[in-house]
A protein has these predicted regions:
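Short glycine-rich, Thr/Ser-proximal phosphate-binding strand/loop in the N-terminal lobe
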Residues: 3, 12-55, 225
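Glycine-rich beta-strand-to-loop/alpha-helix junction loops that act as flexible
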Residues: 8-9, 88-91, 205-207, 323-331
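Short beta-strand-loop/turn "lid" adjacent to the catalytic site in phosphate-handling enzymes
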Residues: 69, 73-121, 142, 149-159
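Glycine-rich phosphate-binding loop of actin/hexokinase-like ATP-binding domains
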Residues: 149-252
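Catalytic phosphate/nucleotide-handling subdomain of diverse soluble enzymes
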Residues: 215, 221-256, 262, 326-357
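Adenine-nucleotide phosphate-binding core of ATP-dependent small-molecule kinases
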Residues: 262, 269-273, 280-315
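Internal helix-turn-beta structural module
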Residues: 295, 299-317, 329-396
């Protein structure tokens, strides 16, 4: 089975052609600078192709994608008919979507309804969907929402303590993001530990970071909120702060709210604390060379991650498994070690030698650790492909 996975941004479109059963990616690429001058980056195995191709809209980007996939020299299929379905990443499903779903007119209207909650991403996601529908009208299309996995949270976790009319009229609540990654890691961890009923905290740590408390495969709480700005401090995002900071800064420095939020989203986090970089590798190098601000940034990050693990351990009444995933979670052993050092009170113990390895799926806790600690490389594209295949096969 061939699933085409589409992740449409405002001026870009990422794609992968994948077998959902084996996880084998036959081709992948990126259409970038859509609406400007257009460039295609295409990869099959170790072979890379870069072409400058005009792409005024996402429709041309989809057409370019399908052409290169069928290309005699660089393609992997002979006909579009070999694509069984298309899975689209959609950022925000709001309160409309609790799971992935086959796209029809009603689904598109509901995604449009969620645009106020995802004003940057949802319109781009819709452009990708409509472009695919135009070029592949008979091929099933599936929407996979970044927020859906977190929709099993109870009201005590997702409601904000603000007047009810903002929830009832404007759907203001905690939604959470990186849901496809959290879902994949939760499923994969269940396979690794050999059971479905257990309590876990997953740490998706990267330039954008989020954590989730999961019980028996269902999300109970997560760190991001109405937007991805909430939770732990990130590469350039502040994470949780006193909301009154916004008013204080706006009043003192003459900023408007949009300018202040731009600062909190793009000029804060590790970049602000270190004064050097948002990249954890740069911070590690800086700390080793005696830069105290770089050391503080990394320590602040580990401290906040550990705090949320502790909070979620309380919310779940204990945890059985702690998982690390995404760029920093999979590759930065020093961050994992420091987080786990904070969690000694939970009986967390890790093997330093195992923890020193990068990017590999493995158990890094010791046999006498009271909590299993795993590194589980995420695979959001595979999760999208599997969700898409399950829905399409069920509809036959």
């Amino acid at each position: 089975m061939n699933i085409l996975i589409i992740n449409a941004g405002s001026s870009s479109l990422k794609y992968q052609l994948m077998d959902p059963d084996t996880g084998v990616v036959s081709a992948k690429g990126l259409c970038e600078r859509i609406g400007i001058d257009g460039r295609l980056n295409h990869k099959v195995g170790d072979n890379k192709v870069v072409k400058d191709i005009p792409m005024p809209t996402h429709s041309e980007a989809i057409a370019t994608t399908l052409e290169i996939l069928q290309d005699a020299e660089h393609g992997v299929i002979k006909s579009v008919d070999e694509i069984d379905a298309v899975g689209h990443r959609v950022l925000h499903g709001g309160m409309e979507f609790f799971d992935s779903c086959i796209i029809n007119d009603e689904v598109i209207k509901a995604i449009e309804k969620c645009i106020p909650l995802g004003p940057l991403h949802n319109p781009a996601n819709l452009m990708g969907i409509r472009a695919c529908q135009a070029v592949m009208p008979t091929t099933p299309q599936v929407a996979v929402f970044d927020t859906a996995f977190h929709m099993t949270m109870p009201p005590k976790a997702y409601r904000y303590a603000i007047p009810t009319e903002y929830y009832e009229n404007d759907s203001i609540r905690r939604y959470g993001f990186h849901g496809t990654s959290h879902k994949y890691v939760a499923r994969r961890t269940a396979e690794l530990v050999g059971k479905k009923e257990f309590k876990m905290v997953n740490c998706h740590l990267d330039n954008g970071s989020s954590m989730s408390a999961v019980k028996d495969g269902k999300c109970q709480d997560t760190t991001m909120g109405l937007t991805p700005l909430a939770g732990v401090p990130m590469g350039t995002r502040s994470g949780d702060i006193d909301p009154a900071v916004v008013q204080f800064i706006c009043n003192k420095y003459g900023m408007n709210v949009d300018e202040c939020l731009n600062m909190l989203n793009k000029k804060s986090g590790m970049l602000a604390l270190s004064g050097v970089s948002s990249d954890f590798r740069d911070l590690e190098d800086g700390a080793k060379n005696g830069n105290e601000d770089c050391a503080l940034a990394r320590e602040k990050f580990c401290y906040e991650v550990a705090k949320f693990v502790g909070a979620y351990a309380a919310a779940l009444n204990g945890i059985d498994v702690l998982t690390f995933t995404a760029g920093v979670g999979e590759n930065d052993g020093a961050v994992r070690a420091r987080v786990c050092e904070y969690l000694g009170f939970l009986g967390v113990k890790i093997d330093p030698e195992l923890n020193s390895k990068r990017g590999k799926e493995m158990l890094i806790s010791t046999p006498d650790s009271k909590v299993q600690v795993w590194v589980v490389p995420t695979n959001e594209e595979l999760m999208i492909a599997q969700d898409t295949a399950e829905l399409v096969n069920a509809a036959k």
